Curated annotation (Swiss-Prot):
<dbReference type="GO" id="GO:0009953">
    <property type="term" value="P:dorsal/ventral pattern formation"/>
</dbReference>
<feature type="glycosylation site" description="N-linked (GlcNAc...) asparagine">
    <location>
        <position position="61"/>
    </location>
</feature>
<dbReference type="GO" id="GO:0051216">
    <property type="term" value="P:cartilage development"/>
</dbReference>
<keyword id="KW-0217">Developmental protein</keyword>
<keyword id="KW-0325">Glycoprotein</keyword>
<keyword id="KW-0221">Differentiation</keyword>
<dbReference type="GO" id="GO:0007517">
    <property type="term" value="P:muscle organ development"/>
</dbReference>
<keyword id="KW-1015">Disulfide bond</keyword>
<dbReference type="GO" id="GO:0030514">
    <property type="term" value="P:negative regulation of BMP signaling pathway"/>
</dbReference>
<feature type="signal peptide">
    <location>
        <begin position="1"/>
        <end position="19"/>
    </location>
</feature>
<feature type="disulfide bond">
    <location>
        <begin position="145"/>
        <end position="182"/>
    </location>
</feature>
<keyword id="KW-0891">Chondrogenesis</keyword>
<feature type="disulfide bond">
    <location>
        <begin position="197"/>
        <end position="205"/>
    </location>
</feature>
<feature type="disulfide bond">
    <location>
        <begin position="174"/>
        <end position="220"/>
    </location>
</feature>
<dbReference type="GO" id="GO:0005615">
    <property type="term" value="C:extracellular space"/>
</dbReference>
<dbReference type="InterPro" id="IPR008717">
    <property type="entry name" value="Noggin"/>
</dbReference>
<comment type="function">
    <text>Patterns the embryo by interrupting bone morphogenetic proteins (BMP) signaling. Binds BMP-4 and BMP-2 with high affinity. Can abolish BMP-4 activity by blocking binding to cognate cell-surface receptors. Capable of inducing dorsal development in embryos. Causes dorsal mesodermal differentiation of animal cap ectoderm when coexpressed with xWNT-8 and nuclear, sequence-specific DNA-binding protein xBRA. None of these molecules causes dorsal mesoderm formation when expressed alone.</text>
</comment>
Amino acid sequence: MDHSQCLVTIYALMVFLGLRIDQGGCQHYLHIRPAPSENLPLVDLIEHPDPIYDPKEKDLNETLLRTLMVGHFDPNFMATILPEERLGVEDLGELDLLLRQKPSGAMPAEIKGLEFYEGLQSKKHRLSKKLRRKLQMWLWSQTFCPVLYTWNDLGTRFWPRYVKVGSCYSKRSCSVPEGMVCKAAKSMHLTILRWRCQRRVQQKCAWITIQYPVISECKCSC
């Protein structure tokens, strides 16, 4: 470890201690990443297992279905066949690490505004801009909560069948000091089609548009 890396590690430990405050609960984590004001539960769709409620081949005409979508088809989040780049649950940890190495978006104000000093209390002075930047980037990478997108198969009763959904990786702590985890903070809605049957006898079925929620932002939270 070179001298610069050693200093970053030492000052990071000093930041750990300096950010602690004597409050209950998890309030002492809020200096690095404030918790969102509310949770964002996304409920799984529950479908009747009886195949009698499935659309028939004639109901899956792609030209007609695209017309019913009225311009809402988003190829970045929707697909009619399973994309090759689909990730499994076991890949999310690796993806989380990869995205945190280069955090996207604007650096959080609470990190950008941090000042770092060295020396005794009576003779302390600010760190160089280069070292200060390294510390800020390190803190940002530790507290960054990227949205991890994977393709989800909704089944034949939805069109497009495959939708890209977001999740927040919660198997690591995202706060300094540790204690908080990444949780959903915001969502967006995709307009897709759902096959709905209103009666079992003399079935009356049709495609209807629905709003499908997808996590769009993750934040550090208690």
